[in-house]
A protein has these predicted regions:
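C-terminal amphipathic helix plus adjacent low-complexity
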Residues: 364, 369, 374-440, 447-448, ...
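Conserved donor-binding/catalytic core segment of Leloir-type glycosyltransferases
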Residues: 215-232, 238-242
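N-terminal subdomain of nucleotide-sugar transferases
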Residues: 1-68, 118, 244, 403-428, ...
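Nucleotide-activated donor-binding/catalytic signature segment of Leloir-type glycosyltransferases, i.e.
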Residues: 258-283, 290
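Aromatic "clamp/platform" in nucleotide-sugar-dependent glycosyltransferases that forms part
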Residues: 296
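Donor nucleotide-sugar binding/catalytic pocket of nucleotide-sugar-dependent glycosyltransferases
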Residues: 143-154, 161-207, 217
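Short hydrophobic beta-strand element within catalytic cores of glycosyltransferases
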Residues: 313-317
Length: 487
């Protein structure tokens, strides 16, 4: 069996969520099949500049075939086209122009799939919203399997993607929330699918003391791992944690790991360490009292899964359906929607060792049952086996003609997004052991039930916060309003 893994960027130094996801899957499937990666020569997801040579390379034993990007992204053109399709009624032609402006525009990659696609038994396309996936799926519909990596942002409301979701052979979803959202927007419930997610190569014996010595960190701390970016919720994290610092009973330091495009508050209990290699990152997570995930947009939080694999509790932004759903299903995390909830959840994990330990124990079990590599690999292999026994009927709707593409009859994508169902979706079995005990246990610190918000007073309706938009579809939380603290 020969598998093509098709993704916008690829390489050991490329740590974007979907790109790392694609590399992990390619390397693990290579143990069971012949795998070739098809990608571009770009390394920068903003410009798509050609920085690597075209042709065939090899990374960790997997052949990688690179194709040139025809032109770099023009941010002004992309911004104008985004405003048009996201905020106003528009045409299918407008959406296709938006896709072309977003990139990475690589006709040579699509030509390869069109002429050589029958060399592969299946083509795995990562990230639905990019040029390579949209046109590549259309070129190889009879063997196309889509890993959407979709977030709850406006791009999901574009009409052009609905035939893609309905026309592939199968979909491998990252989360139950992602599946619910895509099925609601496209009506593709009959397409074979499974919630898979992604595993991680978490070390068996990380060295927390080594991290503390190397970076001279003593005392309890919370860790954030990922890009320090507005779209990751970091401004709100900074605001909320600075409010927590006024609490005389709190002693946590906030340790930030990842490259930053934001100014980091200057405070002795806020430490920005920059980008760390995996050894230091996992040592840091093992040393931390908890991981904080403040992002509004995720299709899957890889870093939360890694924290759970290491037995660390997670405090997550409850305005992100995926993070909220993961916390509920795992019973290994708390979530917040306001500063009051953030503060009380942080206090609970900091001061209640029993709660922290129980959350971490549940996290280990959740990761082992649903995200260990044997589980992930088996889900892919089972899907390949299922599809091999079914006819590959052509279900892809053809593109309309030139005149139909010009009709200004499509709704603003933001309006479509607003109408989609919200909230966490049911999924894997929930471990209720912690909840059953915490509801009857009295401690000096308020103890929220795991998988629930810390406090309920003045709680807004989920999804009622001010709108946030991510322009690049970064959806993983990995090494990728009102209710603020009183001043």
């Amino acid at each position: 069996m020969k598998i093509a893994v098709v993704v916008q960027r690829y390489g050991q130094a490329i740590n974007g969520g979907a790109e790392l996801h694609a590399r992990y899957i390619a390397e693990h499937l290579a143990r069971h099949a012949e795998v070739e990666v098809l990608t571009t020569c770009a390394t920068d997801y903003v410009t798509w500049r050609n920085e690597l040579p075209s042709g065939v390379d090899e990374i960790n034993g997997v052949p990688v075939r690179r194709f040139r990007v025809k032109r770099e992204r023009d941010p002004r053109v992309f911004g104008r086209r985004s405003d048009r399709v996201f905020e106003r009624s528009h045409s299918l032609g407008d959406e296709l122009h938006w896709l072309d402006a977003e990139g990475p525009t690589s006709p040579s990659l699509i030509d390869h799939l069109t002429t050589q696609g029958d060399r592969y038994d299946y083509c795995l396309f990562f990230s639905y919203r990019y040029y390579h996936a949209y046109h590549g799926v259309r070129a190889t519909a009879a063997r196309a399997i889509l890993v959407p990596t979709a977030e709850r942002d406006a791009a999901i409301g574009l009409t052009m993607f609905q035939p893609i979701f309905r026309g592939v052979r199968a979909l491998m979803y990252n989360s139950h929330e992602e599946r619910t959202m895509i099925q609601a927007v496209s009506g593709n419930i009959e397409v074979p699918n499974v919630v898979v997610g992604i595993g991680s190569d978490v070390p068996q014996n990380p060295q927390p003391a080594r991290f503390r010595r190397k970076y001279e960190i003593s005392g309890p701390f919370a860790v954030y791992v990922g890009r320090l970016d507005k779209n990751k919720g970091c401004p709100e994290l900074f605001e909320f944690f600075q409010g927590y610092l006024h609490d005389p009973s709190g002693s946590l330091t906030l340790v930030l790991i990842g490259d930053s495009i934001l100014p980091v508050p200057a405070h002795p209990r806020i430490r920005h360490l920059g980008f760390l290699d995996d050894t230091d990152k996992f040592d840091a997570m093992a040393a931390a009292d908890l991981l904080i995930m403040p992002s509004y947009f995720e299709s899957l939080s890889m870093v939360a899964l890694e924290a759970w694999a290491l037995g660390r509790p997670v405090l997550a932004n409850g305005k992100c359906d995926v993070l909220k759903g993961q916390s509920i299903r795992s019973n290994a995390g708390l979530y917040y929607e306001t500063y009051a909830e953030f503060r009380e959840a942080l206090r609970a994990i900091e001061h209640n060792q029993w709660l922290s330990t129980a959350l971490g124990r549940n996290g280990r079990q959740f990761f082992r049952e649903h995200y260990s590599w044997p589980v992930i690999e088996r889900k892919y292999l089972d899907m390949f086996a299922r599809l091999s026994g079914e006819p590959a009927g052509a279900r892809m709707d053809p593109l309309p003609g030139w005149l139909e593409r010009r009709r200004q009859n499509l709704p603003a994508a933001e309006e479509v997004l607003a109408a989609l169902p919200k909230g966490p979706s049911p999924g894997e079995r929930r471990n209720s052991a912690v909840t059953a005990v915490t509801e009857t246990r009295a401690d000096s610190v308020p103890t929220p039930s795991p998988g629930t918000a810390a406090r309920r007073e003045s709680r807004p309706r989920p999804g009622s916060s001010s709108r946030h938009r991510t322009p690049h579809g970064r959806g993983y939380g990995r090494s990728r309003g009102s209710g603020g603290p009183a001043r």
